[in-house]
Design a protein with these regions (language model features):
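Soluble FAD-dependent oxygen oxidases
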Residues: 2-495
């Protein structure tokens, strides 16, 4: 069984067939907002407020893209985000086509202290890219990616998806670290840090971020980099969406052969101890070219399995040599590691994490893959087709940076554990959340913090998670967003 088949026969098979695949709205012509009456809104502090019809019309006239109200054509499609569990209704949606549009929308929200959510790819697991009764600033039409092959740089719009980035760069024999689900937005993914199958060789996505364009709470359009407003540039590399709306990301690219040694080896769950104990001993010595991470899941027929996903970003002959010990472990159901198009790997999770899935996740940054962690992973395993645990392998180039070099502090983690549940029926919401929380709680003693893109209620406080970077982040937040307009995130409150 190869990796694609494995994924599609586990979580995806039980849920994807019954779910609508929601896609971003197509290009829209300019639509004048015809607000004829005031509408209800909600302030940053949760107080009901009135949004006057004239002000809404003025915003609509100022934007090159449409402003959508409840009942308008396109409103329901625009408000829906990836995670089907979050069904919220903004008072209005500003569908921006330019940085100037974003600045107008930010000014509108700030002047009214209006609750504001930023939708890039709409892939926020906890649903923070949409809000009830506030303003959604929708960047989904700003999805263009341009590649400068001579400079080996990519310029991605704030609404670009990781699939857009991969498509644009791979076409030129170039790549950078991107995530594992192609319909994830570049925006939230990058601002949180950015884990992917190439991070051991190239570092996190933020380590490949050379610059950005951001609209801060004062409505100013800023170009930032290590040379221009370096404190703000430092903060967005791991500090999330706390500091403004990023409308362009400038990425460093690397020469890359998309025909790559990759895939998964799968064993019966009964061999989990042998596999995980081997991995715990083997993984600290991996070369930077080798990304290898375990996962555990149950298929719809009740068969539980453990797998290790592999991507070797280098000479495949050397890669085969490095994989010899892995292939000697146990009696696998299937060895699906082979030469294949990297895009196959980058899209194989898309079905299991399809648009409309009702989903919940928690995560843990783990400093060392210990025997105790192995024991707890086995003891806590939930044999349910709606649940799975994935890992993202760190080390290598991720650890080349110190914990204060960027806002993302977890540089010494060996692994990130991601606990995921997905289901179709709203009646399963409670059990879906409980399974995920219980699994996470059983392994939480091994955690050194969390990846804030997957933050959920009840997670360790933001101050503790950012550790030595928190005070600096709070100072920068106070400078650029003193009113905490951008709070729909893993929030850092201004001083």
């Amino acid at each position: 069984m190869d990796r694609r088949k494995f994924v599609k026969t586990t979580l995806a098979a039980s849920i994807a067939a019954s779910l609508p695949i929601l896609t971003a709205c197509g290009e829209k012509a300019k639509v004048a907002t015809e607000a004829t009456a005031s509408i209800r809104g909600i302030s940053l502090d949760g107080v009901e407020l009135e949004l006057e019809a004239a002000a809404i019309r003025e915003l609509g006239d100022a934007l090159s893209g449409p402003v959508l109200l409840s009942g308008d054509p396109g409103y329901d499609g625009a408000r829906m985000i990836w995670n089907g569990m979050h069904d919220k209704r903004p008072a209005l949606i500003a569908q921006c086509l330019s940085s100037e549009d974003v600045a107008q929308a930010v000014n509108f929200a700030r002047e009214r202290s209006l609750l504001t959510a930023i939708r890039g790819g709409g892939h926020s697991w906890p649903g923070k890219s949409v809000c009830d009764d506030g303003l959604m600033i929708d960047l989904s039409q700003m999805h263009n990616v341009e590649v400068d092959t001579a400079a080996k740089r990519a310029y991605a719009g704030g609404g670009a998806l990781l699939g857009n980035l991969d498509d644009a760069t791979l076409a030129h024999g170039l790549a950078t670290t991107a995530g594992v689900v192609s319909h994830t937005g570049c925006g939230g993914f990058t601002l949180g840090g950015g884990f992917g199958r190439l991070n051991r060789k190239y570092g996190l996505t933020i380590d490949n971020l050379l610059g950005a364009e951001i609209i801060t709470a004062d409505g100013k359009i800023r170009k930032i980099s290590a040379e221009e407003e370096p404190d703000l540039f430092w903060a967005i590399r791991g500090g999330g969406g706390n500091f403004g709306v990023v409308t362009q990301f400038d990425y460093q690219l690397h020469d890359f052969d998309r025909n790559i040694l990759s895939g998964m080896i799968v064993w019966p769950i009964e061999q989990a101890r042998e596999v995980l104990e081997f991995y715990a001993e083997w993984s600290p010595g991996l070369s930077r070219e080798l990304y290898a991470g375990p996962m555990m899941a149950t298929m719809p027929d009740g068969t539980s399995v453990i797998g290790i996903e592999v991507v070797y970003n280098g000479d495949p002959v050397q890669g085969e040599k490095e994989l010899v010990p892995l292939r000697a472990i146990g009696k696998p159901i299937d060895d699906g590691i082979k030469m294949q198009d990297y895009k196959v790997m980058q899209t194989q999770e898309d079905a299991a994490l399809a648009h409309g899935v009702r989903s919940y996740a928690k995560n843990a940054m783990v400093g060392e893959f210990t025997q105790g962690l192995v024991d707890d992973m086995i003891d806590a395993f939930i044999a349910d087709p709606r649940a799975a645990i994935f890992t993202h392998t760190c080390g290598g180039a991720v650890a080349d940076h110190g914990e204060t070099d960027t806002a993302f502090p977890h540089r010494n983690a060996q692994t990130m554990l991601v606990f995921f549940t997905g289901w179709a029926d709203p009646a399963d919401d409670a059990i879906g959340k409980k399974m995920c929380r219980d699994w996470h709680a059983a392994l939480d003693s091994h955690s050194g913090g969390y990846y804030d893109n997957i933050e959920q209620e009840g997670d360790t406080g933001t101050a503790g998670n950012f550790g030595p970077n928190y005070d600096r982040l709070r100072s920068i937040k106070t400078q650029y967003d003193p009113g905490n307009l951008f709070r729909m995130n893993s929030n850092i409150e201004p001083a």
